[in-house]
Curated annotation (Swiss-Prot):
Function statement: Exhibits a very high intrinsic GTPase hydrolysis rate. Involved in the addition of a carboxymethylaminomethyl (cmnm) group at the wobble position (U34) of certain tRNAs, forming tRNA-cmnm(5)s(2)U34.
Name assigned to this protein: tRNA modification GTPase MnmE
Gene, per the UniProt record: mnmE
GO cellular component terms, A-Z: cytosol
Required cofactor names: K(+)
Binding-site list for Mg(2+): 230, 251
GO biological process terms held by the UniProt record: tRNA methylation; tRNA wobble uridine modification
GO molecular function, one term: GTP binding
């Protein structure tokens, strides 16, 4: 699909930088470039060759010195003729260059329109288009590696393979409807269907872990006032994000920041100490703390290594009873000797588990002040959120939309297999097989409507 118009946008982030790039794509990209860019050395444009010159306005006045490159379609990201102009990275300069492109006949691009053209022109499928956005928004190296693997096409290839496994049984079913006197060997239907079901189930099983790597999880720090929750937040973030003082009750509201814990982007929520109070501001902070506990995927119960449980701890510990919880024994820098730390951990674990009524999922000793134990804490949080397995060659389904569509495909394929084994008529088998193939098409983009495409690409930035 080739578009009649040509689009342009700034492809670099807003603000000052070393360079700014204006991207132009469409059938008139080269003619627009020739109108607004004057190379130092005249001559015909050769694709994929960078040229030095100046961007000029309609009167021939120089706007900025620049480097420009022309990429002829379909050997470009959008599969259309594409131009990129690199200029100095000041916001005003880049905006002026864009305005020259628009004045020369380009249209301002919509969010994600370059990537959408790449998809609609067959350059990439929808899984790869979504992976492009995931690369931009990745918050950990693991999430980035998963997105790059998906952009590389592993999921596209696997779904084409599964689709082919479903096409042959569908062809047999269609033939039997038209020519019922023909015979089909059972293995010609059962073998590929069984393989398709197994492959779809395998993909869906990876999604729980993959989605956490991509979207992250929520962990809430809870504990009595002055247990060191804010200090621990700062230590995990490696910045002084929360105000820390020796005065109990310094934190009056919830505070959220994202940390990379064991390769997982975890939204950490620091909370006000949960205590009874007549202060209306403090009571509001406590209520928000309770809400943060309810929304958390994991709780981090912070206690002081140099103190013992008190009555106020009962209510706090009760909030953790139905949630996965790590008991964090903080301030171990105040305890002399490794043996004493172990004895302290053993005592506090027993005491707080007696209050809780059920064991904690893990107990970790840390010092927010010195950093001792923080790496182990990060690894423990990641293990509890993900399980013990690690990504296999980056092959995890990371998108909720993909998971849901593939789960439906697996259900339809399984129903078709069960129906075949029970001798159900071919026309009914074909219904489930077609539904499974269409569900796979929702993932790759072969069976999606304009509304879904708009929803996906509108999340991209302008210029991508």
């Amino acid at each position: 699909m080739m578009y009649d118009d040509t689009i342009a946008a700034i492809a670099t982030p807003p603000g000052e930088g070393g360079i700014g790039i204006v991207r132009i794509s469409g059938k008139d990209a080269l003619s627009i470039l020739e109108r607004i860019f004057v190379p130092v050395r005249p001559g015909r444009w050769k694709p994929y060759r960078m040229r030095y010159g100046h961007v000029v306005d309609g009167a021939g006045v120089r706007v900025d010195e620049a480097l420009a490159v022309f990429m002829r379609g379909p050997r470009s990201f959008t599969a259309e003729d594409t131009v990129e102009i690199s200029v100095h990275g000041g916001p005003l300069v880049v905006e002026r260059v864009l305005q020259q492109a628009l004045a020369a006949g380009a249209r301002a691009a919509n969010p994600g329109e370059f990537t959408m053209r790449a998809f609609l022109n067959g350059r990439i499928d929808l899984t790869q288009a979504e992976a492009t956005l995931d690369i931009i928004t990745a918050r950990t190296t693991t999430a980035l590696a998963l997105a790059e693997a998906q952009l590389g096409g592993w999921l596209s290839h696997e779904l084409r393979r599964i689709r082919a496994l479903l096409i042959d049984p569908l062809a047999y079913c269609t033939a039997l409807v038209d020519f019922p006197e023909d015979e089909v060997e059972p293995q010609d239907v059962e073998t590929p269907l069984t393989a398709a079901v197994q492959a779809l189930d395998t993909l869906v099983a990876t999604a729980e872990q993959g989605i956490i790597y991509r979207q992250g999880a929520r962990a809430t720090l809870v504990g009595r006032p002055n247990a060191g929750k804010s200090s621990l937040l700062n230590a995990l973030l490696r910045i002084d994000r929360a105000i820390v003082t020796p005065i109990p009750g310094t934190t009056r509201d919830t505070l959220e920041e994202t940390a990379n814990l064991g390769g997982v982007p975890v939204v950490l929520t620091d909370t006000a100490g949960i205590v009874e109070s007549v202060d209306p501001v403090e009571r509001l902070g406590v209520e928000r703390s309770r809400q943060a506990v309810a929304q958390a995927d994991l709780l981090l119960l912070v206690v002081e290594g140099v103190s013992q449980p008190v009555d106020d701890d009962r209510e706090i510990v009760a909030l953790t009873r139905d949630k996965r919880t790590v008991l964090i024994v903080n301030k171990i820098d105040l305890i002399d000797g490794a043996d004493a730390v172990q004895e302290c951990m053993k005592f506090l674990k027993c005491a707080y588990e007696n209050l809780r009524g059920v064991p904690f999922d893990a107990t970790i000793a840390v010092s927010a002040l010195t950093g001792q134990g923080l790496d182990m804490l990060g690894a423990t949080v990641a293990r509890l959120l993900l399980g013990d397995s690690s990504p296999a060659d980056g092959r995890l389904v990371t998108n909720v939309r993909h998971r849901d569509a593939l789960a439906r495909a697996a259900t339809h394929a399984r129903d078709a297999l069960d129906s075949f084994r029970r001798g159900v008529s071919p026309d009914l088998l074909a219904v489930d097989l077609t539904a499974a193939i269409n569900a796979i098409g929702e993932v790759t983009g072969e069976a999606v409507g304009d509304d879904l495409l708009h929803a996906i690409f509108s999340r991209f930035c302008i210029g991508k």
